[in-house]
């Protein structure tokens, strides 16, 4: 009987707790997100989305990044989905911990511009990678210091 009561308590606890979460997804599930994707997501119960800025950055000419971000915003708005978070762009080269000070400054400046653009989405949080891996043990401490300083 004690086991049955314990199991019932656990099920009720989990079910009650699970009800606190809303359904969300990420733009990264679609290779090239279209407005129809967001409308379908909304119709199936998705309330929140994380915007993957890499979709607007990777392999894209620099002058097309901002227009693509604005286009992504319009598509999300058309479905009335709330942006929960923005996953800022990252790569082995777009890294705020690199040892080359000139390149690090360029990366930080670019990232600052991306963070400013996030304001139009009104996200709850941002995801920023402080570095990329792998990092050799011999330079790890300096890379951590650079990421912190950036």
Residue ranges with predicted function:
Residues 19, 37-46, 63-86, 112-122, ...:
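Acidic (Asp/Glu)-rich catalytic clusters
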Residues 3-14:
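Sec-dependent N-terminal signal peptides
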Residues 24-26, 40-67, 91:
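N-terminal substrate-binding region of glycoside hydrolase catalytic domains
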Residues 19-36:
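Boundary/entry segment of secreted carbohydrate-active catalytic domains
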Residues 35-37, 77-79, 94-150:
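Active-site acidic/histidine proton-transfer and metal-coordination neighborhood
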Residues 52-77, 130-136:
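Glycine-rich, proline-tolerant flexible connector loops at the mouths of alpha/beta enzymes
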Residues 18-22, 84-96, 131-134:
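N-terminal small/glycine-rich loop or linker at the start of catalytic domains
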């Amino acid at each position: 009987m004690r086991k049955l009561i314990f199991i019932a308590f656990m099920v009720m606890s989990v079910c009650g707790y699970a009800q606190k979460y809303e359904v969300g997804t990420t733009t990264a599930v679609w290779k090239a997100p279209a407005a129809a994707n967001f409308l379908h997501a909304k119709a199936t119960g998705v309330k929140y989305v994380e915007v993957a800025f890499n979709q607007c950055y990777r392999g894209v000419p620099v002058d097309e990044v901002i227009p693509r971000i604005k286009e992504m915003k319009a598509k999300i708005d058309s479905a009335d989905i709330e942006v929960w978070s923005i996953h800022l762009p990252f790569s082995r080269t777009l890294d705020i911990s690199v040892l080359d000070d000139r390149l690090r400054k360029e990366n930080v400046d670019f990232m600052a511009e991306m963070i400013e653009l996030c304001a139009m989405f009104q996200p709850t949080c941002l995801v920023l990678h402080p570095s990329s891996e792998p990092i050799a043990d011999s330079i790890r401490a300096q890379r951590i210091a650079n990421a912190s300083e950036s």
